[in-house]
Amino acid sequence: MLQPQVPVAREGVPFIGFAAFLTLVSAASECEILTFIFLLATAFTLYFFRDPERFVPDDPSALISPADGKIIVIEKTDKQDFIEGEALKISIFMNVFNVHVNRAPIAGKVDKIIYTPGKFYSADSSQGAEYNENCGIVLTTNSGKKIAFVQVAGLIARRIVCWLEPNDTIQSGRRVGLIRFGSRVDLYLPTDTALSVSVGDKVRAGETILGQII
């Protein structure tokens, strides 16, 4: 299932427009150095807020990566507040060069959204995992399983954007938000989820299958 083409995330438009405006003003003033600097800034903001098409696997039981990046944690944990009991946790770290638009990992209905204020430690640190600001989306899949995916702020990424509301029905691969300037997304899954990835694997939001919700 191919998602519609949206070249940049809507949250990026003001940044891109402002950088482009400064480029034009500098060019009109014939200031070559500033024009070059602001042109680079415009190119960077375009690159950072890019939102490319993704080919979403047409498999209702497939768990799809919600973020671009690298898997840094796979573990079982009971230290979480999103789904009952022990959960299988997958953490995906996004660096500043990754696409930062997040996507739904599976189809379902949003039960609740839990925003937790916090710190801004490095997102790939143990402190960041425990104390950083985050926004958790808890949903019930179409097969009746409870899962959660959590947008986590980071040292540079201090702006979490979530486009969902409770009771929203979402399709797998749908754009659901973004985190500005690099951070992480944590998944909390049933412990019987059959994974097909390992720590260190690089993944793409909306395309990479992480496993199957049994």
UniProtKB/Swiss-Prot annotation:
How does the record say this protein sits in the membrane?
A: Peripheral membrane protein
Kindly indicate whether the keyword Lipid metabolism belongs to this entry: yes
Query: What reaction does this catalyse?
Result: a 1,2-diacyl-sn-glycero-3-phospho-L-serine + H(+) = a 1,2-diacyl-sn-glycero-3-phosphoethanolamine + CO2
Q: Which GO terms describe its cellular component?
A: plasma membrane
Cofactor(s) required, per the database record: pyruvate
Which residues get modified to Pyruvic acid (Ser)? 183
Record keyword 4Fe-4S present: no
The protein's location, in the record's own words, is: Cell membrane
**Post-translation changes:** Is synthesized initially as an inactive proenzyme. Formation of the active enzyme involves a self-maturation process in which the active site pyruvoyl group is generated from an internal serine residue via an autocatalytic post-translational modification. Two non-identical subunits are generated from the proenzyme in this reaction, and the pyruvate is formed at the N-terminus of the alpha chain, which is derived from the carboxyl end of the proenzyme.
Alphabetically sorted, this entry's keywords are: Cell membrane, Decarboxylase, Lipid biosynthesis, Lipid metabolism, Lyase, Membrane, Phospholipid biosynthesis, Phospholipid metabolism, Pyruvate, Zymogen
> Matching Pfam families, A to Z?
PS_Dcarbxylase
Instruction: Quote the pathway field.
Output: Phospholipid metabolism; phosphatidylethanolamine biosynthesis; phosphatidylethanolamine from CDP-diacylglycerol: step 2/2
Task: Give the EC number(s) under which this enzyme is classified.
Answer: 4.1.1.65
Q: Which InterPro entries does UniProt cross-reference here?
A: PS_Dcarbxylase (IPR003817), PSD-A (IPR033175)
**Active-site residues?**
183 (schiff-base intermediate with substrate)
Q: How is the cofactor bound?
A: Binds 1 pyruvoyl group covalently per subunit.
Q: Name one GO biological process term.
A: phosphatidylethanolamine biosynthetic process
> Mind listing the GO molecular function terms for this protein?
phosphatidylserine decarboxylase activity
Organism domain of life: Bacteria
Q: Return the annotated site residues (Cleavage (non-hydrolytic)).
A: 182-183
What is the similarity comment for this entry?
Belongs to the phosphatidylserine decarboxylase family. PSD-A subfamily.
Q: How does it assemble?
A: Heterodimer of a large membrane-associated beta subunit and a small pyruvoyl-containing alpha subunit.
Q: What is the role of the protein in this entry?
A: Catalyzes the formation of phosphatidylethanolamine (PtdEtn) from phosphatidylserine (PtdSer).
Instruction: Write the protein's name.
Output: Phosphatidylserine decarboxylase proenzyme
Lineage of this protein's species? Answer: Bacteria, Pseudomonadati, Thermodesulfobacteriota, Desulfobulbia, Desulfobulbales
